[in-house]
């Protein structure tokens, strides 16, 4: 059987009919079907789970005449398997036994009690603690796109309206959703093809009236005007679909989702998808997280602070007032070194943001409450440090963080110091919190003393030295005697079980005690679970304040982190200016300087109305791309409030950062390297403004020399003359160095290098003026290109240069198409002798003689 057919249920066994009915309700998910101590999967689910999880595929009899493929996994190990499936973007429906097997006629009643999808995770074990886990929904309208994201683990709900595919692509890359819902009428499938975890939803789920009503019900408001989103029709349709999906999967109230924010692209510096990729903000070009800007800047002490920092990196602000408030806060934290004290306190606070959400969803575990108690206990100490702050923003954060003395007192009374992982077996509620619970526990715990007394008494009365009292879940309490002493057992003992070396018995007194003990244990556990549920009710009224406390603590963590990074890495506070331009003195690349084995060479840059474009030339590997990227990264860092790796920086208004650096074939879309390059260039030429920072690196490659040169020249001229964008334009077309002679706002700069014979030393220093040459052959030699190829290339280079200069030499008159000789270069006796020389073994006299001999060989 390869397909599940709910219509033909009558031919299956009762259990399989139950399974198939439940599976039909969750066709796109793996169904974990509880069978005793295992979760079992059948049919195609079993085959898929076997492949994804590496578990055995077997068969479970037949149903409907066909073998049933089956795979199983232990219930106690389910979280590990769920974590693996979530990473693979696979959703799971978990079906539990909710009926009593003892009273059930036919299959035990079962129900799907939990749905785990990649975008709706809240369980600590399934989440990456330092990364947001976003569920997104996308709706396409006639005027653009509506896009909504929700971090279920924090309640952060954001919508935005996007005018075109370029903006949508950038937003998808910025948010990087774990799961994406899209309507069945969505037409731009190439934009979402690379996203794992996409879910196609019926068009009616995006109905505006239904979505609008859903959101009103969630927020408990009469309209959405208070959120400023009433006119965002497309994104409200996306948000409504998303909200319904979360309700369906969580199957509980969602009180932590209590607001919605509209993200306006005009509030932040626009970074398109290519720019985010090329600048390696949080993910490097290979898809990893090492050697990124985040890897250098993120020394936060809380997971929620780390997540906030990454959001800031992808959303640099344009509002100078907010940026300056952050700068002033960092300055004060540095001035009195309070960031060190605050960071120690924040480290102990942990991830309150996600703990608060689990409390709101009523799926928090005992240790979540213990961590919340620990965090609340630290607040007086944290506030004592913050009260010394003069910076207005630090005062504001102190006010928002607040204190929670009543909740701290409650948790201190209610929860033991080191609670178990789960409430299932009790032991969570502290002694003294509830008098009735204490009484039931005493009755239960007193059983142990009684059993010891009974065992000692029976040993003495019977004379059986091996007699002992035991317990198991099947037979309850029993008296165990070795087989060799079983003839001493009194007639009043009733045999319960015979084992290989022992006999087990019961007596009426022990049975009566068992009933009392089990009754007291059961009542104690039931009451403890009831008190546990009441804890949620007592904490939830403070939910909003706890969420604010978490967000403010995360921001304080980021600011303390920026202070630490500034001091540790020698960063300085940039000046924000209303005058256009970017001026950086002794700027450094924040990532390269950390991974470089040699001292980083700092370089300046000046861009203003009189100097809008810099034509950057110099050798391959000379540092052109590094130089350009560092200007963009310093500019971006300045706009998140961070200090920057420069002696001094003045940054004017910036609305966008564009990068056209490097390219590769887009095989999925069937686009060549050159096509990708031209598409990115077109985007820049259509959207750049005088306040945009543009990085253009080596455009025009991948086509003929004259085509490439013409395109590069025209693009540079258009940027400088018509758009007047702040541009760094790196090129190997030396003809472009003539642009400053034609345009007054263009200048030449170059990366310096020193040639020594056939070798080259890169100085990595930016100098005014154009480079004299590109040193391509020297770089090729450094890369290990065979000497014969280098020699042939030198010959061809001389031939080309001779022709270009109109020389009448024999070489110049030879056709360029002539065959190149790749014979090895003639050996040099002088070089061979020099290679065999060990200078440490020579006396001064021998060295002088050797030098004369080398000169003769060279001649």
Swiss-Prot record:
GO cellular component: cytosol
High-level lineage: Bacteria, Pseudomonadati, Pseudomonadota, Gammaproteobacteria, Alteromonadales
Name of protein: DNA mismatch repair protein MutS
HAMAP family noted in UniProt: MutS
Gene behind this protein: mutS
GO terms under biological process: mismatch repair
Keywords recorded for this protein, A-Z: ATP-binding, DNA damage, DNA repair, DNA-binding, Nucleotide-binding
Highest taxon, organism lineage: Bacteria
Family: Belongs to the DNA mismatch repair MutS family.
GO molecular function: ATP binding; ATP-dependent DNA damage sensor activity; damaged DNA binding; mismatched DNA binding
UniProt binding sites for ATP: 618-625
InterPro entries per the UniProt record, alphabetical: DNA_mismatch_repair_MutS (IPR005748), DNA_mismatch_repair_MutS-lik_N (IPR007695), DNA_mismatch_repair_MutS/MSH (IPR017261), DNA_mismatch_repair_MutS_C (IPR000432), DNA_mismatch_repair_MutS_clamp (IPR007861), DNA_mismatch_repair_MutS_core (IPR007696), DNA_mismatch_repair_MutS_N (IPR016151), DNA_mismatch_repair_MutS_sf (IPR036187)
Species the sequence originates in: Shewanella halifaxensis (strain HAW-EB4)
The protein's role, per its UniProt record: This protein is involved in the repair of mismatches in DNA. It is possible that it carries out the mismatch recognition step. This protein has a weak ATPase activity.
């Amino acid at each position: 059987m390869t397909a599940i057919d709910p219509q033909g249920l009558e031919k299956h066994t009762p259990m399989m009919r139950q399974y198939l009915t439940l599976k039909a309700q969750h066709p796109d998910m793996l169904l974990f079907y509880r069978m005793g101590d295992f979760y079992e999967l059948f049919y195609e689910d079993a085959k898929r789970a076997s492949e994804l999880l590496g578990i055995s595929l077997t068969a479970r009899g037949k149903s409907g005449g066909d073998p049933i493929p089956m795979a199983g996994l232990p219930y106690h190990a389910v979280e590990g398997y769920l974590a693996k499936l979530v990473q693979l973007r696979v959703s799971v429906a978990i079906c539990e036994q909710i009926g009593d097997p003892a009273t059930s006629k036919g299959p035990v009643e079962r129900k799907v009690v939990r749905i785990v999808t990649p975008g709706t995770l809240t369980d600590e074990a399934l989440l990456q603690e330092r990364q947001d886990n976003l569920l997104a929904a996308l709706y396409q309208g006639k005027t653009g796109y509506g896009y909504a994201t929700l971090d279920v683990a924090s309640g952060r709900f954001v919508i935005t309206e996007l005018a075109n595919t370029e903006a949508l692509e950038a937003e998808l890359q910025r948010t990087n959703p774990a799961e994406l819902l899209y309507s069945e009428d969505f037409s731009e499938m190439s934009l979402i093809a690379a996203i794992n975890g996409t879910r196609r939803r019926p068009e009616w789920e995006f109905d505006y009236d239904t979505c609008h009503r859903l959101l009103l019900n969630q927020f408990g408001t009469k309209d959405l005007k208070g959120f400023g989103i009433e006119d965002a029709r497309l994104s409200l349709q996306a948000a409504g679909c998303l909200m319904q999906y979360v309700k369906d999967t969580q199957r509980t109230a969602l009180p932590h989702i209590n607001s919605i924010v509209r993200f306006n692209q005009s509030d932040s510096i626009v970074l398109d998808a290519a720019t985010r990729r090329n600048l390696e903000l949080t993910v490097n070009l290979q898809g990893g997280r090492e050697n990124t800007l985040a890897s250098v800047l993120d020394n936060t002490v809380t997971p929620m602070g780390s997540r906030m920092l990454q959001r800031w990196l992808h959303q640099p602000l344009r509002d100078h007032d907010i940026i300056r408030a952050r700068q002033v806060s960092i300055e004060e934290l540095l001035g009195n070194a309070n960031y060190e004290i605050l960071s120690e306190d924040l480290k102990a606070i942990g991830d309150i943001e996600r703990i608060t959400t689990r409390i709101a969803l009523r799926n928090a575990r005992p240790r979540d409450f213990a961590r919340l108690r620990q965090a609340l206990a630290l607040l007086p100490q944290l506030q004592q440090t913050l009260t010394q702050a003069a910076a207005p923003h630090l005062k504001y954060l102190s006010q928002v963080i607040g204190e929670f003395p009543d909740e701290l007192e409650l948790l201190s009374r209610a929860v033991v110091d080191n609670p178990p992982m789960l409430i299932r077996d009790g032991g969570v509620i502290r002694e003294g919190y509830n008098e009735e619970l204490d009484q039931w526990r005493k009755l239960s715990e007193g059983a142990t003393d009684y059993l010891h007394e009974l065992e000692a008494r029976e040993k003495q009365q019977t004379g059986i030295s091996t007699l002992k009292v035991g317990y198991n879940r099947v037979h309850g309490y029993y008296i165990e005697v070795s087989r060799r002493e079983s003839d001493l057992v009194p007639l009043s003992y009733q045999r319960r079980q015979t084992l290989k070396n022992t006999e087990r018995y019961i007596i009426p007194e022990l049975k009566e005690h068992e009933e009392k003990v089990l009754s007291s244990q059961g009542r104690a556990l039931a009451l403890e679970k009831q008190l546990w549920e009441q804890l949620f009710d007592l904490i939830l009224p403070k939910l909003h304040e706890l969420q604010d406390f978490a967000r403010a603590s995360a921001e304080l963590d980021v600011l303390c982190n920026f202070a630490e990074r500034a001091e540790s890495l020698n960063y300085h506070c940039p000046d924000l200016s209303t005058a256009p331009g970017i001026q950086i003195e002794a700027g450094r690349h924040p990532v390269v300087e950390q991974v470089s084995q040699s001292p980083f060479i700092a370089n300046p840059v000046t861009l203003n109305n009189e100097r809008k474009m810099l034509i950057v030339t110099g050798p391959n590997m000379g540092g052109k791309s590094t130089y350009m990227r560092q200007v963009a990264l310093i500019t971006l860092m300045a706009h998140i409030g961070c200090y920057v790796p420069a002696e001094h920086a003045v940054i004017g208004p910036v609305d966008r950062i564009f990068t056209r650096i490097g390219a590769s074939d887009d095989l999925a879309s069937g686009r060549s390297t050159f096509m990708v390059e031209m598409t990115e260039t077109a985007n820049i030429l259509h959207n750049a403004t005088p306040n945009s920072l543009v990085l253009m690196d080596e455009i025009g490659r991948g086509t003929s020399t004259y085509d490439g040169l013409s395109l590069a020249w025209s693009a540079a001229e258009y940027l400088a003359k018509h758009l007047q964008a702040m541009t760094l334009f790196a090129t190997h077309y030396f003809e472009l160095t003539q642009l400053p002679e034609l345009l007054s706002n263009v200048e030449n700069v170059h990366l310096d290098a020193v040639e020594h014979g056939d070798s080259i030393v890169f100085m990595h220093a930016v100098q005014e003026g154009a480079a004299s040459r590109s040193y391509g052959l020297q770089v090729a030699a450094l890369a290990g290109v065979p000497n014969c190829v280098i020699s042939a290339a030198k010959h061809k280079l001389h031939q080309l240069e001779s022709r270009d200069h109109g020389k009448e030499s024999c070489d110049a008159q030879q056709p360029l198409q002539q065959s190149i000789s790749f014979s090895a270069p003639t050996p040099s006796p002088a070089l061979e002798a020099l290679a065999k020389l060990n200078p440490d073994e020579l006396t001064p006299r021998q060295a002088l003689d050797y030098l004369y001999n080398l000169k003769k060989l060279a001649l």
